[in-house]
Amino acid sequence: PFREGCVGESAAAHEARVSGEAADDEALRRVLAGIADDEERHALTAWKFMRWAVTELGAVARDALRDEIARLESESSPTRFDQGELSRHGVLDDDARLALRAEVVRDVVLPCARALLVADAGQVPLRAA
């Protein structure tokens, strides 16, 4: 749930949002914005599940989450990208997608995951990426 839901869906939402903002075609921008909205809802569901797991399963879930945080922190990914020519058509190249994923992990996933470990579940604000 954490890798696919929290990380994957958050990254997919950000990728769709950035792709849509870069697209020249208005219809494509609307489609990609809709996809981004859907992916954000999926990510939010995953984060809610993680909050439940940490609260209900206690140490087992917290230890597993700590392991995932450590894995994410040890991964290296590009942190900058040039959107290039394809971006105006709503397409990002592999380097751009990897850089966006790294941005989401750094700015959204890791802070939210750490918050789950230290805050009472009732105090953790959950927002889509």
Give the location of each predicted region.
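Non-heme di-metal
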Residues: 1-129
